[in-house]
Every structure is written in structure tokens, then in C-alpha cells.
Amino acid sequence: MKRVRVIGAGISGSEACYQLLKRNYLVELFEVKSIKKNPIQTNDMFANLAYSDSFHSNEITSAKGLLKQEMRLLDSLIINAADYAKVANEPLLVDRYKFQEYITNYLRSHQNLKIIEKEYITIDDSVPTIIATGPLSSVNLENEIKNLVGESNFNLFDKVEPIVLKSSINLNYVQKSALDDKLFYCTLNKNEFEYLYNLIISAEIFVSPLPNEIKLLHDNGFRSIETVAKSSKNELKNLLQANEIRQTENTYATVLLREDDYNENFLRIVNFQTSIKIPWQNEIIKAVPALANALILRYGVMHKNDYINSANVLDDNFQLKSNPNIFFAGQLTGTDGYVEASASAIICAINVDRYLRNLPKAIPNNKTVIGSLCNYVLIANKEDFQPMEANWGLVESMNLVSYNNEGKKKLSDRAISEIKEFIKQNL
């Protein structure tokens, strides 16, 4: 029986173990939480959740809901556990204790899983290994990963800017840059700027389970849009002022959008990284006239979040380019969110199995949410890599005119067919 090592028994590590055990591997699982917990871990069970509502929509007309359905077809431990422990279906809310208990009991009772409860400090490439230690790895392992991928490819924090769908913005309020065809300026008059400013400074802030996270971010040079605004109105005005746009009554301030290098459907709202809660972010973004009816694909976040530049250091199957016996999965790869982290672990484990059986790599295509998400983090912009969560902008669009429920149902039906074909051909 072949042996594979998994580092970390969080969401992605637990999923990776399950997928490998199903494929008849002897799995060594390293987990340190019974000896040394990170600041948000509260017990010794596997797959700790910080919140009970972490699974978002269950509807297949939502990209996150469709991702869960794709994962059900791929027999995901995490989604099986969430369905078992659910207390509400839409959005999918779970009882955290039941969820963690389901996963822990299954894995601990499996005869082919060897649990090693100690800190994993030195990466040993003599054994095929999946590193899945999540956003809060131990300092020792952080240093080991830095040595493995290079310090410039390892990040301790993220500052993710909101993304809107390019085709959904109102071009009547947009000026294109004369210097860079990837830049777009959303214009605001003075009253619109004042309204935006007041929304930002009065917005409700997300309270992290990690103590002093916002202070930690600020101390390391990461400033949110609300921090800038609360410093002074003039400082926000300076941030939202483009040198190449002449200031007039209708261009008192500008919000800059930048087209993503990998996916031209994505426009990032530059400098809008934030810890503001999503309902308030939604109101703030919609207050920009050009974005009043925009489809928001993802919201801004700022986290203490360990992740590697996957597009730079991983092959297109989550395998380290410089060492084929090492794979990465979960939040560490830039798949952002519990479900997304688990999704990457499924695909990673499938490809570990294929690597050890000398079979070609296998990842679902971009007509699926799971495939488009994995392909994005593995092939995206190497220079400005940011974590990504499931959204419709990643998925091949079928040239939809509108992302209404009818259009999204078509995308969902196609994705389910594609996943079934992927399973038939590869699993």
C-alpha cells in the first residue's frame, strides 16, 4: 500500500485525507492542534470552523451553490458533513460541533489513517506530501514553506480588492485611460464623493475571530479604504484622484478599475481593500454611479492569511514545480473560503493519485466552478496574485447577455454535465 503524507487536519487537509483513503492509500496525517492551537482554534477536533454560517448559498443559480453541487458529485467529505450538520438549507448553515464531529469520527476510525499529533517542522520530500496547513500555519512551518517556494512567493497577509463584471458597468460614467488600456476611471462629482465618503466612515466593520487582526494588518503596512477615509476626507480624496483625469465639476474624484491580466471579465476596484461587512460594501460600491447596477463578483477582504503565489510555483495540478513529490491544497493555494479550500483539496488529491499511478493530470474545465476556480489560482497573474473565491466571472460565459436566474441555470446545467463527464473519464 502506497503512503502519502498530509500536513494539517483543517478543512482542506481533512478533505485530502478522505479522498486519498478512498483510493486505498496509507495516509499519515500530521496535526499539532492537540499540543499547540492557533489563535482561532477552540478544540482538538478536525476541520474547525470559525463561524456556523460559513457555507453560503446552496442554490445552483449561485456560483457558490453550484460549486457545492459539483463537490457532492465528486463525493466531498466536507460537503457531506455540512449536509449532515445543516440547520438551514438556504443559505447552508451548519452546527459547527456536529460538522467537526462527523469529520473527526470518520477520519479517526479509518484503519488506513495514521494520525501523528506533533508539529511538522521539516518538509520531507522522500514521501509524497500535501501541505494543507491553512491561513494560520505555525511560524516554523511558515519559514519552511518560504524556503521551499522562495520568500517573494509566500504571503502572510492578503488585501483583496472587490471585483465587478466588466460588462455590467455603466460606461456613461467611465473614462478610459489614455496610458493603459486596462485602466478605467469611474467619475464622481462632489456630492457623489461626499456621499461615498460618509458611507465608508459609517460602515460596520467585520470583527475577526483572530485577536487584533486589523491592528496586525495596519502595523504591517496594509491600509484599508475605511482607514484612509477615517484619517481625513482629504486623504480619501487624494487616493481617489487620477493624475491623467482633469478635475472638473463632474470629475471631482475617480474610482479606478483595473482589468485582470488573466480574466478580462474581471475589473478590480483599486485601493478598495477593506474589512467592511459585505452589506455595507455592497452599498458603497453601488454608490459609484458607474457601478450602480454592476454585478459584484467578489467583495474586498483583509486577512492574516498565509498563501503562496500558486501561479508562480505550482504546476497546473497543485504540484510544486521544483519538487514533484510536494503538493499544496486549500487556503494556502489562494482558494479563498472553506468550500473553495475543500474544492482545491479534492482536485489536489485526485492528482496526487494520478501522479503516483503515472497517469496524466486531470482538472475539470472552465465550464465548471471547481475547474475555473482551480485553473484561476494556478494560471492567474503571477505579478499581482490575489486569493480568489467561487464566482460566475470565472466560468466560461456561454456569451450570456444577462446573469439572471435563467442564464445562471443554463451555466449550472452545463457545469453538472461537465462534472459528470469528468468523473466518467477520470475517476
From Swiss-Prot:
**Alphabetized HAMAP family for the sequence:** TrmFO
Entry keyword set? Cytoplasm, FAD, Flavoprotein, Methyltransferase, NAD, NADP, Transferase, tRNA processing
Spell out the molecular function terms from Gene Ontology.
flavin adenine dinucleotide binding; tRNA (uracil(54)-C5)-methyltransferase activity, 5,10-methylenetetrahydrofolate-dependent
Where it sits in the cell: the answer is: Cytoplasm
- Gene3D superfamilies xrefs: FAD/NAD(P)-binding domain (3.50.50.60)
**Source domain of life:** Bacteria
In its keyword annotation, does this UniProt entry include Ribonucleoprotein?
no
* Single GO BP term: tRNA methylation
Q: Cofactor(s) for this protein? A: FAD
What this chain does, per the record? Catalyzes the folate-dependent formation of 5-methyl-uridine at position 54 (M-5-U54) in all tRNAs.
Q: What is this protein called?
A: Methylenetetrahydrofolate--tRNA-(uracil-5-)-methyltransferase TrmFO
EC identifiers of the protein: 2.1.1.74
* Residues holding FAD: G8, A9, G10, I11, S12, G13
Q: Which family does it belong to?
A: Belongs to the MnmG family. TrmFO subfamily.
Q: Name the GO cellular-component terms.
A: cytosol
